[in-house]
């Protein structure tokens, strides 16, 4: 096969499906078969082989887009070809992609994006005056008046200033726009900061404390950079809260072989859906101060708080209100347009605020960021709409607040629905979804199912998830991909399917679980 044909087939497998969703799977058999290489060179003569590839890339795993998702994509293609299955569609409850699950875009954001992408329509289109002005302001800040131009590597200054104003209004403490960096999604900002820690000290590797269960971005990034992961367990019996005792246990164990240098906190939680109390945050801050740890505050779900009595507190706000010495601690906080009420995952927009970094360290971080050129201008434009939304009295305000409220109210109802339904099912235990976009139920599996999983070479929760997918078309993420206490089994499901589809999914889930339990009893 010619190289052109091989590349063509690989690209074809990634084209948009009839539903407009990009498949996550590439036909690897094309690339791995020894009979399809474009020349007669043997494997031994390849410049890059599995013997000399970066071992950190081999170790890297990302469960949210792992084998189950690949299989789900294959099943979708099989259904499109008329395959006979006991279901007609795949329900992707595995990933926090709101728009893919039917959430409608926020009008103000999309109108501004339309105008900056095609300036000719600003005056020709029937847009509100505040949309027109915002688009003009963004374009004025772009080189050549076009979002097609590179921006400053750290983001457009005007938008960084708006983010700083947003943070200051949220927390009640000053925010310097020079410490705000616009990023291509919060994930990029997190990875940029993690790179600062890649250094052996006195012969010991650097390590980062990560909550267990955790969002797989962290374990994947630590593996990629050769950093060590030190897990601290969240307490499922206490609504996925945490204790100082557990933090100290984790730190002491990690410090024996490594240099523990940072702690990651995800609030509201992914995959666990908890919202930390102010007391919890204060305890973490005091712990981090006692051990001189850098804090990664992953706060991308700060708008997603549902449970009565729950409230989001930013780490920066709590640190500042605690006063000295805590208000001098080093912190990086992260926000994204992918979550919240916006759900603009594909635009890849977000920001990070750097607090109390050593000026020389921050200069070197900015140097590293410069090598990546700049985040997407459209993503930055979406950030501007989030950081500075329409104000009361402006033409777009009434529709904006209506749409925002509808999205968050609907998510609130779905959060309650999913927890209540799982708790009514035998063998399930699900904590209240206080915030974020996920439930993380614990499931009791029959001993025979656990034995069948072992024979199949799979973890029990992975075995269960594959059975669920093959029999119902529902795609979830096994708890194994996030980490869990030994002897317990969980899975993560999003609350993002629209209400009717979510109810359908839960009904199918109930029927499947009853059959599964009966089969392996």
Where are each of the predicted segments found?
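Conserved core segment of the aminotransferase class I/II
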Residues: 6, 46-50, 130-137, 224, ...
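Short beta-strand
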Residues: 83-84, 90-92, 429-434, 521
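PLP-dependent enzyme catalytic core of the Aspartate aminotransferase-like
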Residues: 2-10, 24, 119-120, 124, ...
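Generic structural signal for small/hydrophobic residues in well-ordered secondary structure
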Residues: 68, 93, 163, 180, ...
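Conserved core of the PLP fold type I
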Residues: 115-292, 296, 302-325, 332-333, ...
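N-terminal mitochondrial targeting presequence
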Residues: 1-48
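N-terminal "arm"/small-domain region of PLP-dependent enzymes with the aminotransferase-like
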Residues: 32, 40-154, 165, 169, ...
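Conserved PLP-binding catalytic core of the aspartate aminotransferase-like
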Residues: 100-102, 107, 401-412, 416-471, ...
């Amino acid at each position: 096969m010619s190289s052109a044909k091989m590349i063509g087939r690989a690209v074809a497998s990634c084209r948009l499906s009839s539903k407009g969703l990009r498949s996550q799977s590439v036909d690897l058999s094309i690339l791995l078969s020894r009979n399809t290489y474009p020349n007669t060179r043997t494997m031994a003569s390849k410049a890059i082989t599995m013997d000399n590839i970066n071992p950190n890339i081999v170790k890297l795993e990302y469960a949210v887009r792992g084998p189950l998702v690949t299989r789900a994509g294959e099943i979708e293609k099989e259904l499109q070809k008329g395959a006979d299955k006991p279901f007609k569609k795949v329900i992707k409850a595995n990933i926090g992609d709101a728009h893919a699950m039917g959430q409608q875009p926020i009008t103000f954001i999309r109108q501004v994006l339309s105008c900056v992408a095609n300036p000719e329509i600003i005056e020709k289109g029937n847009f509100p005056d505040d949309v027109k002005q915002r688009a003009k302001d963004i374009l004025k800040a772009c080189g050549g008046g076009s979002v097609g131009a590179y921006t400053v590597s750290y983001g457009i200054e005007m938008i960084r200033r708006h983010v700083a104003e947003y943070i200051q209004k949220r927390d009640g403490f000053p925010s310097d726009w020079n410490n705000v960096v616009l990023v291509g999604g919060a994930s990029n900002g997190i990875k940029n900061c993690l790179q600062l820690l890649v250094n052996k000290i006195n012969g010991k590797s650097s390590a980062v404390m990560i909550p267990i269960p955790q969002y797989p971005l962290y374990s994947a990034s630590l593996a990629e950079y050769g950093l060590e992961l030190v897990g601290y367990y969240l307490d499922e019996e206490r609504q996925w809260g945490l204790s100082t005792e557990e933090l100290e246990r984790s730190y002491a164990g990690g410090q024996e072989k490594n240099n523990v240098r940072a702690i990651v906190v995800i609030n509201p939680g992914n995959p666990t859906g908890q919202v930390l109390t102010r007391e919890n945050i204060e305890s973490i801050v005091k712990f981090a101060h006692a051990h001189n740890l850098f804090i990664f505050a992953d706060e991308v779900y700060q708008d997603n708080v549902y449970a009565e009595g729950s409230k989001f507190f930013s780490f920066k706000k709590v640190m500042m209100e605690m006063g000295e010495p805590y208000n001098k601690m080093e912190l990086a906080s992260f926000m994204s347009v992918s979550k919240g009420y916006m759900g603009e995952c594909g635009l890849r927009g977000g920001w990070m605020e750097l607090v109390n970094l050593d000026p020389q360290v921050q200069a070197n971080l900015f140097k590293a960021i410069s090598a990546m050129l700049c985040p997407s201008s459209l993503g930055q434009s979406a950030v501007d709409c989030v950081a500075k939304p329409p104000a009361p009295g402006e033409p777009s305000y009434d529709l904006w607040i209506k749409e925002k409220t509808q999205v968050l109210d609907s998510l609130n109802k779905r959060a309650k629905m999913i927890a209540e339904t799982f708790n009514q099912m035998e063998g399930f235990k699900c904590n209240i979804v206080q915030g974020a976009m996920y439930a993380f139920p614990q499931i009791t599996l029959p001993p025979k199912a656990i034995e069948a999983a072992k024979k199949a070479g799979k973890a029990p929760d992975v075995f269960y998830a594959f059975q669920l997918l093959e029999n119902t078309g529902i795609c979830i993420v096994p708890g194994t991909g996030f980490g869990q206490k030994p002897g317990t089994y969980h899975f993560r499901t999003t609350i993002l399917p629209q209400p009717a589809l979510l109810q359908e999914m839960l009904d199918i889930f109930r029927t499947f679980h009853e059959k599964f339990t009966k089969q392996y009893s």
